[in-house]
């Protein structure tokens, strides 16, 4: 992706799942003086949001949650056939926002429901200065579009 050499990239997906990613990222950020960007899906965030109870993290946190109402990754797997039970049990389908939780934990909450709102929120989110409070950006996306994009991505990997 052509990142500058001084940019460090860490990744933690857990064991093909969501658990522990937020707690691990917050722990790493606590030991760092740099701004730390944490990007999670909604299910990963909601399953690990109690990590925010530990308020020892600093204001160098930039937390982005991609909220598409459930786990699009599961729906993009071959052989997945959605029905009401499958959507609820396997993908964690929901209609929940993280706004109240983020604000309650002292994070500055930003949101985007479309490209225009995302472009408006990004300058504050990526600003290189440490802010008074950690920043939280919730990006609402369309799950069907996300599923299709993932399927296309997986197809492109097979061609490579």
Residue ranges and their predicted role:
Residues 1-160:
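Thiamine diphosphate
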